[in-house]
Amino acid sequence: MKHKIRLGVNVDHVATLRQVRGGTTAYPNLLDMVKKSVKGGAEQITIHLREDRRHIQLEDLKVLSKHCSVPLNLEMAATSQMVTYAKKYRPDWVCFVPEKRAELTTEGGLDVKKGFKKMFPMVEKLQRIGIEISMFIEPSLEQVEASYEIGADAVEFHTGKWVMLKGARKAAEWKRLCDAAEWAHYLGLNVHAGHGLDYEHSKLINKLPHLQEVNIGHSLVCYALEHGMEESVRKMRKILK
C-alpha cells in the first residue's frame, strides 16, 4: 500500500504580500496563515530566508521556530551567515538551495558536486545538532550521487522544468525525475519534490517513485486569495494520497 505523501506548505508569498510596501504593514500575518495551513492539513511549513530578504525576514524565522506546531523546513543558500542562523533557530530541516539576486524565483537546482568542498562542513555542523539536510537539485543521477556523498538525508527534485514543458519533452523530463528518484531511493535518500506544482501537476507527481514529501507555495497562496488558506491547503491535501 502506497504511503501518504507529506505536504509541506511554503508561505514565502504570504510574506511577499506583506513586504510589497517595504515591510511597513503587519498584514497578512504570517503566523496566522501558518496556523490556517496546518488546520487545512499542512504537515510541514517551508520558508526561504533569502539573502536579499525579499519576502521572509529573520524575525519570521525567529517567530516560527518558537510557534510553528509542525516541522519547520528552512530553505537557504550555502553561506556561513545562513548556517549561523540555522544553528541559532534550529529548524527541523535545512534545504540548501541556489540563489541569484536578479532571479524572480529559484531558477534551477543546486550544483552539489561543484559546491561539495564548501558545503560538506556545513552539512556536518547542522546534522551534529539534529537538523536534517536536503539538497534542492535537478533530477540528475550525478547530483543525486553528490548529495549522497555529502551526507544529505534527502534530495528535493526541482520540478519547475517538468511543469513548464509540453509533449515529448515533458515525458522525457518525467523519465529523468523517475530515474533520479529510483537512484536516490537505492542510495537510501528520502525523495522530496517541489517548485511550480499546482493542483493538476500534484495529481501527476503522486506517481513519482518513492516520493515522500512535496513543498508547494505559490499556487496555494494564489488559490487562497479566493478561497482562503485553510481551504487551499485542504484541497491539495486531498490530492496527495
Curated annotation (Swiss-Prot):
What the entry lists under PANTHER family is as follows:
PYRIDOXINE 5'-PHOSPHATE SYNTHASE
Residues given in the record as 3-amino-2-oxopropyl phosphate binding sites: N10, R21, G196, G217, H218
Q: Which family does it belong to?
A: Belongs to the PNP synthase family.
Q: Which residues form the active site?
A: H48, E75, H195
Protein's job: Catalyzes the complicated ring closure reaction between the two acyclic compounds 1-deoxy-D-xylulose-5-phosphate (DXP) and 3-amino-2-oxopropyl phosphate (1-amino-acetone-3-phosphate or AAP) to form pyridoxine 5'-phosphate (PNP) and inorganic phosphate.
The protein's annotated pathway:
Cofactor biosynthesis; pyridoxine 5'-phosphate biosynthesis; pyridoxine 5'-phosphate from D-erythrose 4-phosphate: step 5/5
Its GO CC terms are: cytosol
Where located? Answer: Cytoplasm
A single GO molecular function term of this UniProt record:
pyridoxine 5'-phosphate synthase activity
Instruction: State whether keyword Cytoplasm applies.
Output: yes
GO biological process terms, semicolon-separated: pyridoxine biosynthetic process
**This protein is called what?**
Pyridoxine 5'-phosphate synthase
Which gene is transcribed and translated to give this protein? pdxJ
Catalytic activity reported: 3-amino-2-oxopropyl phosphate + 1-deoxy-D-xylulose 5-phosphate = pyridoxine 5'-phosphate + phosphate + 2 H2O + H(+)
Q: Which domain of life is it from?
A: Bacteria
Q: Where is this site: Transition state stabilizer?
A: E156
**Where is it predominantly found?**
cytoplasm
Binding residues for 1-deoxy-D-xylulose 5-phosphate, per the UniProt record?
Answer: D12, H13, R50, H55, T105
Q: Name one Pfam family in it.
A: PdxJ
